[in-house]
């Protein structure tokens, strides 16, 4: 595998929602697609998502210390970089400020890693905007995580927010 290109960071989204499950399922069902990727999030959240899937095949979590380490791992494991304080177990399907904060912190970490050149790209799993706003400052300043990405990029480059273009792509099977 090429190691001259940084890996891709996936943020787990809202731990009370479908984001962690989507990511875990991708690693289980399409390991060839996730080969140069890692989760920038919480190990416990991802363990819980894997358990939810009740998959016939075991998928171990590899706790990594840096984004680059994801490129050195063998296939059939889920690399997770713990970028937030360990999360408590949160209830499924509930708007929770703690979940919003975790989701926002993961996106912020991944954004900064991309701006430093440590990751080639960011993929964000779904997060709940209401939970993000419930987390309070600074998360309630942004309508969603796209605006958070824009604000952090503007801050990093030293340009006014209005002059910072945002390029994003939505991807699905349809």
Question: Where are the language model's segments positioned?
Answer:
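Anion-binding alpha/beta catalytic cores of soluble intermediary-metabolism enzymes, centered on
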Residues: 1-174
């Amino acid at each position: 595998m090429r190691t001259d290109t940084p890996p891709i960071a996936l943020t787990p989204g809202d731990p009370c929602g479908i984001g962690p499950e989507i990511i875990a399922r991708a690693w289980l069902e399409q390991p060839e697609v996730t080969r140069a990727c890692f989760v920038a999030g919480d190990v416990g959240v991802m363990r819980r998502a894997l358990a939810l899937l009740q998959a016939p095949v075991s998928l171990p979590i590899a706790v990594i210390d840096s984004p680059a380490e994801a490129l050195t791992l063998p296939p059939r494991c889920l690399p997770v970089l713990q970028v937030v304080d360990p999360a408590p177990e949160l209830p499924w399907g509930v708007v929770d400020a703690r979940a919003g904060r975790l989701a926002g912190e993961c996106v912020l970490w991944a954004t900064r890693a991309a701006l430093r050149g440590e990751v080639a790209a960011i993929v964000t799993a779904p997060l709940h905007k209401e939970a993000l706003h419930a987390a309070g400052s600074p998360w309630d300043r942004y309508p969603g995580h796209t605006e958070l990405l824009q604000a952090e990029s503007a801050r990093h480059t030293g340009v006014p927010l209005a002059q910072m273009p945002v390029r994003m792509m939505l991807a699905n099977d349809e």
